[in-house]
Amino acid sequence: MTVKTADVIIVGGGVHGASTAYELAKAGVKVVLFEKEYLGSGGSGRSAAGLRQHFGTETNLHMAKYNLQVFPTLEEELDTGMPLEFTQWGYMWVAYADSVLAQLQKNVDLQRSLDIPSVMMTPDEVKARWPYLCMDGIIGVAFCGDDGHINPQTLTLSYGHAARRLGATVKTYCPVVKLLAENGKIKGVVTEDGEEWHAPKVLLSAGPWSTPLAATVGVELPGYPERHNLLITEPVEVFDCPMVLCLDDGAYFKQCPNGTFMFGRDDPGEPHTTECSNSAKFLEGVTKSVLKRIPALSGVRVVRQWSGPYDNTPDHNAIIDWTPVEGLLVDCGWSGHGLQFGPAGGRVCKELLMGEKPFVDLHRFRLSRFAENDLFFEPAFI
């Protein structure tokens, strides 16, 4: 059997794997990416794809701010002919309790200290700007007008296609079944058809599939999958509805550029599985919840429903770190907010793989924090 080689192997064709492949190919690195199905077939392509700078920790905010600097010109940069549907209609966090409102104020104060244009708004101010929203029970909101929406499928595909155009090898429908290591160093990967590829550096960025793959070389990751559901409606008149996140029951909704509405809700008790099955309980619950907030959508038909896996960690924050196996880098565990971090994730992984200093301090994302019981809690987690 002929062993093939590369400078860097990437396992996982979600947005982080694809963006890293793009960044490396742009730098002239010989990179090969393996994806078990099609690009974006896992969590990335099934994402609600809200873009936000509403976080409550400096580490996440620095990366989120970078993302929103990249997105406005990314379609032109990648130049694949696919529309990314980037819009900046804003992102709203809605408080129904004093304690929640106080935390939102703390988050906004931190954001504004980093020159992120977030604001607190009263119910009257919200009603004046978005008269179709029902304000019952709302005591205040946090809002950032620079935040918005992107198409998760075309974003991931565009990164992958641009990487291929620049010389990267992108192998879809080519599952990696195990990693290879020797004398404590990464050696490469083996695919389902028995093909062996060697490289001195491997990036494992396969969402919830990262945990079992890391175990093939003795690396224990704390990630686990959790199913989350979404639905999309038929299109209606476009009225630039922002992403609205209701912090009483976790429901959220937004209008997409084609006029459709996307609904989601974080229901408790969802199974820890990568299986993308549908939930009738979700369909009934989320429609009732969202229609209370935006009654104008009553009678609008649901076109389809789907689910996808979050890649959760115990503190619901990502892992971006070298593992105990020399040369094996992991970028996983984003716990539901990874799609929007595609630009920042690709940049820092490229910097690490090329021996450069990352543009942000990644200490809080280190793998050892779990064993050290020094968890990285984010107050603006959904």
Predicted regions and their residues:
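Beta1/beta-strand and adjacent pyrophosphate-binding region of the FAD-binding site
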Residues: 2-14, 32
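Glycine-rich FAD pyrophosphate-binding loop
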Residues: 25-44
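C-terminal catalytic lobe of FAD-dependent flavoproteins
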Residues: 152, 291-382
